[in-house]
Amino acid sequence: MSDYTKGDHVEWNSEAGMVRGVIREIHTEDVEFKGRMRRCSTDEPQYEIESDKTGHLAMHKGSALRKID
């Protein structure tokens, strides 16, 4: 089951430090993202997130995210 919903504001740790963004899509089936196959399921969805600062898209598992206000 999904821990987050579209529109949630979240943050995650990247090699450049903490990044904040908004969840744009929730993937529950395998999907290719930026040239790599991402394994997704209803039990372990992956979240497509748009960075607040750069507008770039990232994809992460829920365990890598933290919901913020």
Model regions and ranges:
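Basic/aromatic-rich interaction segments and small domains that mediate binding to polyanionic partners
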Residues: D3-H60, I68
